[in-house]
Amino acid sequence: MKLILTADVDHLGAVGDTVEVKDGYGRNFLLPRGLAIVASRGAQKQADDIRRARETKAVRDLDHANEFKTAIEALGPVTLPVKTAGDSGKLFGSVTAGDVVAAIKKAGGPNLDKRIVRLPKAHIKALGTHPVAVHLHPEVDVEVPLEVVPQS
């Protein structure tokens, strides 16, 4: 059975791909769930339009990610003042991805989602400079030096 995917399906293809599947898989799984439509001339044209739109969006997303990367790199080291537990340099609590996003925004950077921030460990628990990776796009990553300093 020849189908055109209307959603990404693991181990099968992406939106707009024309795939050949067994009849039962197509009739009993893909079609009822709206994951695919039967391939026809009109459906093929629609799939081509979807594919073109997806490619345009991918290029736009990559350009947008590169703009964010340039803006973040222009910031230089980002300073984050935190409360310390004493003179030992240990923090009262820890620095999370949300704290990093807030520090980048406060430094004049773009508004980011905390889920794209990759800390060197689960949480930062000491003063000093820590490299923090920001995953903007599958092809674009940027490393931000984060200076954790005691709050005055």
Swiss-Prot record:
The name under which this protein is listed is Large ribosomal subunit protein bL9
Q: Which PANTHER family match?
A: 50S RIBOSOMAL PROTEIN L9
Cite the entry's keywords alphabetically.
Answer: Ribonucleoprotein, Ribosomal protein, RNA-binding, rRNA-binding
Gene3D superfamilies for this protein: Ribosomal protein L9, C-terminal domain (3.10.430.100), Ribosomal protein L9, N-terminal domain (3.40.5.10)
Q: Which GO terms describe its cellular component?
A: ribonucleoprotein complex; ribosome
Q: Which GO terms describe its biological process?
A: translation
What is the organism field in this record?
Mycolicibacterium paratuberculosis (strain ATCC BAA-968 / K-10) (Mycobacterium paratuberculosis)
Give GO terms: molecular function aspect only.
rRNA binding; structural constituent of ribosome
Q: Which family does it belong to?
A: Belongs to the bacterial ribosomal protein bL9 family.
Record has Hydrolase as a keyword: no
State the protein's purpose.
Binds to the 23S rRNA.
Kindly indicate whether the keyword Ribonucleoprotein belongs to this entry.
yes
